Every structure is written in structure tokens, then in C-alpha cells.
Regions:
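Contiguous beta-strand/loop segments that form the cofactor/metal-binding neighborhood of enzyme cores
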Residues: 184-279, 307-318
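Beta-strand-loop-alpha-helix segment that lines the small-molecule cofactor/substrate pocket
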Residues: 66, 72-73, 77-124, 139
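Conserved SAM-binding strand-loop segment of SAM-dependent methyltransferases
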Residues: 48-55
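C-terminal helix-rich "cap/oligomerization" subdomain common to oxidoreductases
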Residues: 26, 66-68, 104, 112-115, ...
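Predominantly a Rossmann-like dinucleotide-binding segment in NAD(P)-dependent oxidoreductases
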Residues: 11, 123-228, 344
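Hydrophobic residues in well-ordered beta-strands that form the structural core
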Residues: 12, 92, 117-119, 248, ...
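Active-site loop of classical SDR/Rossmann-like NAD(P)-dependent oxidoreductases
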Residues: 11, 274, 296-308
């Protein structure tokens, strides 16, 4: 199956491209990027494909069956919609879009075209996350009444002044960049419960004085002090569902010293703490004694799992848990948190 990668930045090189290269049924025909040197560098690094600048050239090729959209958030909807209408199957990196309205338009076009539109919520292909989901589905934790997600860093604002910190491009900050993963894990593991109300507050504090922002390292590029910083660097929220209450506390940067990145699933029979990107611990009691253990199992690369499943679903027609229909609720929740923060009130979802 001939595929193309649109956007040849960090996530493309770290995840999408190597995973396609490792899939025997995939052949990368195009590397596309608006910066010609990036596309050409990919051709030279991986020894295959053709470098192009305009993604419309990719979509015009009838041999291309699937594309990965790995661009900045602001063009996720446009490129994905154009690709769907050109008859291509799409894996669009997270977040699907900057706003819930944009995500709805993507979903609408997917329904019209019938082509695949999956979103890069890669943790749905994480073996650790899927084992937690099985614990919950099998009733091992009993009634899950509360889930808390913490995605807090001491100093981790990406590319200060660049695309990540410009609302017109990214759509938001810590919530839309990191929170999307945590909220998606919670919803997935808990069976995608219906959301009733959302309350939240987003803060832009540590990065607003860009030249005064102290840090030890900065991913996504060096600071651009003549750039823009108008997104949230921290966020808090509470989401009431027909299942558990979900609370969240996230930050690219806070004065906390140590990073705190985990999810606590709290049930009346047991609990689980997932250390993000790592293993998890199960807490319970048995025969009057408290128990605590870490399951031991083989962890496969979740990005490889994601790409393999994407290729397979195109061939078989199987609908994946990362399909736009399933994950669009995350876009709605994030939008509601931002709306709640701006309006200073609780948001009710229909």
C-alpha cells in the first residue's frame, strides 16, 4: 500500500515514518513539507520516496491510498478534509483540530466520503493502557467513581514564541497538547461514558514574560522572543460523566520542582496508578491485608501498533478505537474547558 507523510517534523520522524518503514505492507511514496529541506532530508535518511512541497501533488496521485497528517494543528482540518475528498484514508495527528467546530467538520466529511479518518490518540494502542482497560472492563476495580489525571511539568514549555505557543496555530497550550492524551486515556479505559458537565480554568502565567522565563532545556526549538505566547501553560478541570467524575491538573510549566505525570483510577474494589508512558501499579485488599503489585508483560511500541492497525483497517474495513466518531468527545471536552474558563461558569454538554 502506497502512503504519504505530510509534514516531516518531529512526530513524523520519531513515530510515523519509522513505523511505516517497519510495516511490510506499506511503501512511502512521498515525503511532503512546506520546508523543502525537511522533505528532502527524509528522502535521504530513509532511502525511499519523493520529496514534495505542495500536499495537493500527493493527493492528485491515484496510487496513494493513505496519508499521515503530521503538520501544525491549524492545518489538520484543511489537509485531512482535502485528503478525504480526494479518496485518501487519513491518520491525522492529535489533536484532531484546534476547536470542536473544526473537528465536527472533519467528522462530517468522513461520513460523506466513507474513507478512514483516524486521530493519533496513540495510547489506545498502548499495551499498558489496554491492560488497564481490561482490568476495568472485567470489574477488577469495582465501580470506578473518580479518575484523576496529572500532567504537570516544572519547566517544559515547547518552542517558546513559536507554533506551540501561538493560539492561532496550535489552538491552545498544555491542555490541547498534553491533556488530549490524558483525557483520551481516561475516556477509553472507562468505556467512553457520556459527559454531562465540564468546569475548568486555564492559566497563562509563567510564559507570558518570555524573556524572564527560566528553563533548563526546551523541546520544539529555541525561544523566539519576538514571537507569540497566548496559550495556557497550566489548566485545571472537573468533568462529570454518567460514569466517574474526572479531575485534571496539567501544566507545561509550574513551580513544582518535580514533574508529576500520572493517572489514578479509583474504584471501590481497587485502584490503579498509571505512570504516563511507563508501567502501572494495582492497589487493593485481600484477606484483610492491603495488596500492591505491578503487572509484568511485554510492551510493544505503541506507535508501531497504531500504524499497523491503520494499514490493516484500510484493508479490512474494521473501525478502530481511534476513529473520529469515537474520539471527537475529547475535542468537545477540551473546548468546554476553555469555554468554562473564558465564561467563568460550568458548561453543560448535550
Amino acid at each position: 500500500m502506497k502512503v504519504a507523510v505530510i509534514g516531516c517534523g518531529t512526530i513524523a520522524n520519531a513515530a510515523h515514518i519509522p513505523s511505516y518503514m517497519n510495516n511490510p505492507e506499506a511503501e512511502i511514496k512521498y515525503f511532503c513539507d512546506i520546508i523543502p529541506e525537511r522533505a528532502q532530508a527524509a528522502v535521504e535518511k530513509y532511502g525511499c520516496g519523493t520529496a514534495v512541497v505542495d500536499y495537493h501533488d500527493v493527493l492528485a496521485d491515484p496510487e496513494v491510498e493513505a496519508v499521515s497528517v503530521c503538520t501544525p494543528n491549524n492545518v489538520h482540518p484543511t489537509i485531512s478534509i482535502d485528503a478525504l475528498r480526494a479518496g485518501k484514508n487519513v491518520l491525522c495527528e492529535k489533536p484532531a483540530a484546534r476547536t470542536y467546530k473544526e473537528a465536527l467538520e472533519m467528522q462530517k466529511v468522513q461520513h460523506e466520503t466513507g474513507k478512514v479518518l483516524n486521530i493519533g490518540v496513540v495510547n489506545r494502542f498502548n499495551d499498558s493502557v489496554n491492560l488497564i482497560k481490561k482490568y476495568i472492563d472485567d470489574g477488577k476495580l469495582g465501580n470506578i467513581y473518580h479518575v484523576h489525571a496529572s500532567f504537570r511539568a516544572h519547566r517544559s514549555i515547547p518552542g517558546l514564541g513559536g507554533a506551540f505557543t501561538t493560539k492561532a496555530i496550535a489552538g491552545g497550550g498544555a491542555l490541547i497538547d498534553w491533556g488530549v492524551h490524558y483525557l483520551d486515556i481516561v475516556m477509553y479505559c472507562c468505556g467512553d461514558p457520556k459527559v454531562k458537565t465540564v468546569t475548568g480554568e486555564a492559566f497563562c502565567e509563567l510564559g507570558k514574560d518570555m524573556k524572564g522565563y527560566a528553563y533548563t532545556d526546551m523541546w520544539a526549538g529555541s525561544p523566539k522572543y519576538d514571537g507569540t505566547y497566548d496559550v495556557d501553560d497550566s489548566v485545571v478541570g472537573m468533568i462529570r460523566t454518567e460514569g466517574p467524575v474526572i479531575s485534571l491538573h496539567g501544566a507545561w510549566a509550574q513551580n513544582i520542582g518535580e514533574n508529576e505525570c500520572y493517572i489514578d483510577f479509583m474504584g471501590d474494589k481497587g485502584g490503579i496508578r498509571l505512570q504516563y508512558g511507563k508501567d502501572f501499579t494495582v492497589y487493593s485488599s485481600e484477606y484483610g491485608a492491603l495488596t500492591e503489585y505491578k503487572p509484568v508483560f511485554k510492551m510493544r511500541d505503541h506507535f508501531q501498533n497504531e500504524i499497523d492497525a491503520f494499514i490493516d483497517c484500510i484493508k479490512t474495513g474494521k473501525k478502530l478505537p481511534s476513529h473520529i466518531d469515537t474520539v471527537i468527545i475529547t475535542a468537545q471536552m477540551m473546548q468546554a474547558i476553555y469555554d468554562s474558563s473564558e465564561q467563568h461558569k460550568e458548561i453543560t454538554l448535550g
